[in-house]
């Protein structure tokens, strides 16, 4: 049985934007820790073994990127509603 919830559009957008800000801050923190400029660069360097012991952060980064894309899609959906 599915439940539905009514939510103010502006409030929903604010929640999504706040979550996006947290995700992006976490992405920047990981990139800064490894002194790389982009997520793609870090993932590639980790796969090549150029960043030793970065596997856990690279996996977290991949998950954060997925979450960022999901939130961006949700933001666009809610914004267009």
Where are these regions (language model features)?
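Short, charge-rich amphipathic interface segments used for partner binding and complex assembly
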Residues: 44-67
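Residue-level signal for short amphipathic helical patches enriched in basic/charged
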Residues: 18, 37, 78
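Short, charge-rich amphipathic alpha-helices with coiled-coil/heptad character
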Residues: 1-11, 46
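Long amphipathic alpha-helical coiled-coil segments
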Residues: 70-81
């Amino acid at each position: 049985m599915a439940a539905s919830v009514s939510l103010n559009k502006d409030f929903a957008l604010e929640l999504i934007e706040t979550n996006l800000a947290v995700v992006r801050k976490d992405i920047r923190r990981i990139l800064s820790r490894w002194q790389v400029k982009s997520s793609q660069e870090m993932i590639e360097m980790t796969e090549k073994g150029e960043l030793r012991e970065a596997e856990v952060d690279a996996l977290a980064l991949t998950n954060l990127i997925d979450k960022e894309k999901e939130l961006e899609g949700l933001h666009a959906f809610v914004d267009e509603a």
